[in-house]
Regions:
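Short loop->beta-strand "edge-of-pocket" segments that line small-molecule binding or catalytic clefts
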Residues: 41-57, 148-166, 200
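Short helices/loops that flank or line small-molecule/ion binding pockets
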Residues: 82-104, 175-176, 187-206
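An extracytoplasmic/periplasmic, membrane-proximal ligand-sensing/linker region
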Residues: 259-320
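A conserved helix-loop-strand patch within extracytoplasmic ligand-binding domains
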Residues: 124-169
Length: 320
């Protein structure tokens, strides 16, 4: 096959017409290609999946996929990379800010060593319908009766809670004068509870069943208190590195579409439909606590929202 550039060196008696043809052809090759002729590069989302317990992870991942699918027509294809490294909360946030290893991450707050909230977009959309802060109490099954008799904050303060060191719940519980035993690894909490190192493990009503289920048999069986829960305002948001504004814009657009067409509600019901059945029994005494990590105004707003949405299904008792 003749090299088209070699035509430029043809003898003069053949050159002028062919040279004009080649120049026109080369000029056309240099024109920009339209979006219809060349597909745009896919959105590359590097999603950190280890920030929460197994009771929330499946829903959170499916929600990210839903938001990306809802915007496929407007924003094109995507590549979703799951980052499941065992990182501390602060390290995962720092990596998210850089936007290289991780660029998308669920979080309840953005603080910690070497962490700067100015480096992420916090999408304002509701993720868990105000129920993340409604904490079921996972206890040893042989101590369920001890938690049947808790009706006031000072009664719960006689027991010790267990928490992971870098969770925001630690500051909330300690602020409300609830004794807390800490560990750096979430996987240590259940064996510690079984060994009487502390008395209860407060986890969201959404995740507690999945977390306790593998430990609900045998002499050291764990169970969820059917009579006592606590609530403190704790919202979860999808956060995106400010190095990736297009991802933040796309996920925000996906939230709008999925909220309007009801698909977020359907996804929530798929994963957490059991909560409505549980609340309908109207047996839970729920102790209301304040969250010192947010403003008094925000505390008041979120507590009022919880009471409005779920108050008819639970007996609420305010902290002293």
């Amino acid at each position: 096959m003749t090299n088209p550039l070699s035509l430029l060196a043809l003898p003069p008696r053949f050159g002028p017409t062919l040279r004009r043809i080649v120049f026109i052809w080369l000029a056309l090759l240099c024109l920009p290609v339209s979006g219809q002729e060349l597909a745009a590069e896919p959105t590359i989302v590097r999603y950190f999946s280890k920030g929460n317990t197994e009771g929330l992870r499946a829903y959170q991942l499916e929600l990210v996929k839903l938001l990306l699918e809802k915007t496929r027509a407007t924003h094109g294809d995507y590549s979703l990379i799951i980052v499941d490294s065992d990182l501390s909360a602060a390290r995962a946030k720092a990596e998210t800010e850089k936007g290289e290893l991780i660029n998308t991450h669920y979080a309840t707050e953005w603080s910690g060593e070497f962490v700067n909230a100015e480096n992420v977009y916090v999408l304002p959309h509701s993720v868990l319908k105000g129920l993340l802060g409604m904490r079921s109490l996972i206890v040893r099954e042989d101590r369920l009766r001890d938690f049947e008799r808790i009706y006031q904050h000072n009664q719960l303060a006689l027991f010790k809670a267990g928490q992971r060191t870098d969770w925001p719940d630690v500051e909330i519980l300690e602020y409300n004068k609830l004794p807390t035993i800490l560990t750096e690894q979430f996987t240590s909490l259940r064996p510690m509870l079984q060994a009487h190192r502390f008395d209860y493990l407060p986890l969201s009503i959404l995740e507690a069943p999945a977390v306790s289920a593998p430990f609900n048999t045998g002499s050291n069986a764990l169970a969820i208190s059917p009579s006592t829960a606590i609530f403190y305002p704790l919202a979860m948001h999808l956060c995106v590195s400010k190095t990736k504004p297009k991802i933040a814009e796309r996920l925000g657009a996906g939230f709008t579409i999925a909220s309007e067409d009801g698909s977020i509600d359907a996804l929530f019901e798929k994963h957490f439909g059991f909560v409505a059945t549980l609340l309908a029994q109207k047996k839970l005494t729920t102790l209301i606590l304040n969250n010192p990590l947010i403003s008094p105004t925000e505390n008041k707003r979120l507590i009022a929202e919880f009471i409005n949405n779920y108050g008819p299904y639970t007996k609420t008792v305010y902290s002293e």
